Structures are given as C-alpha cells and as structure tokens.
Amino acid sequence: LLESKSFVFNVAFINFSGVQLLLDVFSQLENKNIKGKILTSTYLNFTQIKALEKLKEFSNIELRIYDCNHTNIGFHAKSYIFEFENFYEVIVGSSNITASAFKTNIEWNVKTTLKKEDEFLKNILNEFDNLWKDSFEVNEEFLRNYEFFVNQQKEQTFIYKQKIKTNFMQKNALEKLEILRQKDQTKALIIAATGSGKTYLSAFDVK
C-alpha cells in the first residue's frame, strides 16, 4: 500500500476496529500525497458512523457509500485495488475492513497482478466506476441522516409472532383460576415446571 501510486477499496462493511489498524498507514499515505478512494455500503447497517467519520479526516481519501436502503439491492463486494507504475495488484475475497477480518477470521482472498491494458482489470475498474457513480458522498448531512436511521432500527424490536397465545398449561390454569374467582376465592398457588410459562401465565391472568 505504501509503495502504490493510488488505491481503491470496495467493501461492504467498515467498522472502527478495522480503521484503527490502518490509521498509521493512512497517515503515511496522506503525507506522501498518495490518493485513494474508499467505497462502502449501508448493507445490513453494519458500517459504523464512527469509522466513516474517522476516514473523512484524511484529505487524500475520497469516501462514498452505496445506500442499499435506497436501491433495495444488497452490496457484498470486497476488493482492494492498488495502482503501481506499470501494473495493478488486485485482491478480491471475503475480507471487509474490520479487525476480525484482518486478524482472526477465516477469510479467503486472492491476489492477482495485472498489466494496465489487461481486459479483466478494465472490467473491474469500470464496474467500480459504475458503483462509485451510483453512491453518495459521505458528508455531514449523510452521516447525520444515516445515524438517525440506524438508531431508529436499534429501538425497534423484531417479534416474529406479534400476538402471544396461551399454551395448554396456561389455558387450563386460567380456566381453573376463573372457577375459583366465581366461588369468591382470593388465593391460589400455581406449581409448574421450569420453562412452562408461569411468568406469561401471570401476565395473562392480570390481563
């Protein structure tokens, strides 16, 4: 990376732990005025705001984001492209910019060296250019809107079945409790196995 003329990162996810591992290198690249483009995405809302904010601090890096919520298309690419004097090196595989991807995960990545006139390289760069044009600049407005959206998602709890129904034990117990109340009884003791639903039974009874 430090010996390259320019670089392009095209990854689905970026988190702060991954950016931290690259800070020293990015600082050296900035000092050497080696420019780069980084494209990431909102796919699964996994890319972290803090990571994007940190990357924006580097004057030599252009940062854009592909908004999957806008296009309704998943973005799962992982490629790293390095330009040298007479050739390119391209790494394509499974690694996002995360600490776990760089250090601990089982990841499969393939590096290939390509001449600048190589047709395969031209296809890769053209595809990246198309994605770049379809993405958004990571500016303050985007960051605030994305942060608001992500926070909203965190506040929502996913429940597969919205309506909770009584099981056999609970239904039977509720019927017997009702019989006791009809007889003006004010006390009852319920004994049931662990995990059978006593807490929910209490809630159903209160309801």
Residue spans for each PLM region:
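A general structural signal marking secondary-structure boundaries and capping sites
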Residues: 135, 181-184
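PLD/PLD-like phosphodiesterase catalytic module centered on the HKD motif
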Residues: 1-175
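Walker A/P-loop
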Residues: 183-205
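Generic structural signal for well-ordered alpha-helical scaffold segments
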Residues: 174, 178-179, 206-207
